[in-house]
Amino acid sequence: MIVIKDAHFLTSSSQLFQCPASLTSEMVILGRSNVGKSSFINTLLGKNLAKSSATPGKTRLANFFSTTWEDKENALTTTFNVIDLPGFGYAKVSKNLKKEWEGFLWELLSVRVSIKLFIHLVDARHLNLEIDKNAKENIQALLRPDQAYLSLFTKFDKLNKNEQHRLFLNAPKPFLINTTHFNALSSKYPTLEIVRQTLLKYLLTNPL
């Protein structure tokens, strides 16, 4: 069982020199505007820390959070950072993540050695969008051998049971979701505990 011992906001950065020192492993959370990033981060960290932008598509800040998790089963305590990136694809003409994030954000992803895991949030109701396909290609193209990329489906509870099952069968594994009611789902779907364990496992595969 994973216990969240601490979770707090560190800083917001708009330039590389404003970012905190790379002293611990980091996971990046990215996704389209309105995909549910803030909801997922708050669920993951067990605390209402992330706020939705009042002007989606306008802010170009990277928000850093620090958290400490205790894995009781393995007697392991880990402190790491979560980096919340601005939602992409807000402008209808935006089809290219790298171009949209040119400058600070793309440089951050390219050079920050402490980033070990990219979590790409995808709206379970809107699969195979061009901007999500492009984002996946762009992120995977810059992955180092010590980094991993995972997809996680948000708003899973908005699907009916047949749609949930179809997504479960066809989605890449590990199958990861976020929902407002984990306990109401069938036992074949991952619990919040399993989501946390999976992300921690990938984060620690190549620790800083």
UniProtKB/Swiss-Prot annotation:
Its cofactor is Mg(2+). Residues 23-205 form the EngB-type G domain. Gene3D superfamilies: P-loop containing nucleotide triphosphate hydrolases. Coiled coil: none annotated. It comes from the Bacteria. GTP binds at residues 31-38, 57-61, 84-87, 154-157, 182-184. SUPFAM superfamilies: P-loop containing nucleoside triphosphate hydrolases. It holds the Pfam family MMR_HSR1. Mg(2+) binds at residues 38, 59. GO terms for cellular component: cytosol. One of its GO terms (molecular function) is GTP binding. One of its GO terms (biological process) is division septum assembly. Keywords: Cell cycle, Cell division, GTP-binding, Magnesium, Metal-binding, Nucleotide-binding, Septation. InterPro entries: G_ENGB_dom, GTP-bd, GTP-bd_ribosome_bio_YsxC, P-loop_NTPase. Belongs to the TRAFAC class TrmE-Era-EngA-EngB-Septin-like GTPase superfamily. EngB GTPase family. Necessary for normal cell division and for the maintenance of normal septation. NCBIfam families: GTPase_YsxC. This is Probable GTP-binding protein EngB. It comes from Helicobacter pylori (strain HPAG1).
